[in-house]
Amino acid sequence: MERLYILNPYDSNHINLLMSYEQEHKVSTKSLESIMKVRDSLTEEEYKQLKKNANEIELSIFTEESGKIKDLCFIQGENDIRTCKLFFSPTPEKVRTRKLLNLATDFALNTLGMQSVFVVTTANDKTMHINLENCGYENLGEEKGSIIYLKEREVEKVQHKHQ
């Protein structure tokens, strides 16, 4: 059964899963770089306190199945402007649907309270483009070989009835 986790920099199992993922897929992720920086500079208590009060958001979520990370997303954003970017790890196999895209988008909009979620992907990653568009992202165009996508929180429209 596939499960969703928030990557905990102080959970040795999470770190081992992430290191195994990087080795298996021969990739370097923002997630490992970020948590190692946290572990080297803050105690767990300092980290928890900082997270409560920080304007900046830097965290990773991942799906795990059968003791391995299946997919990984690094989230970087700012609480005051309620905007974030999602960075997905490259997956070597051709994934037709990327379940973590929906989960990460919902997490950013509903759990973190973001208004705008951006994803930047390479121009040649057609599968990711299809997944983003199927998830309701708007293609904002190409910049320096990358395609920028945006999904905004749907604001409930208040209709005024004239009586």
Where are these regions (language model features)?
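Conserved N-terminal entry element of GNAT/NAT acetyltransferase domains
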Residues: 1-20, 25-29, 155-163
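A short gly/proline-enriched turn/hairpin at secondary-structure junctions
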Residues: 27-37
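Acetyl-CoA-dependent GNAT
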Residues: 39-83
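Conserved beta-strand-loop-alpha-helix junction that forms the acyl-donor binding cleft
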Residues: 118-130
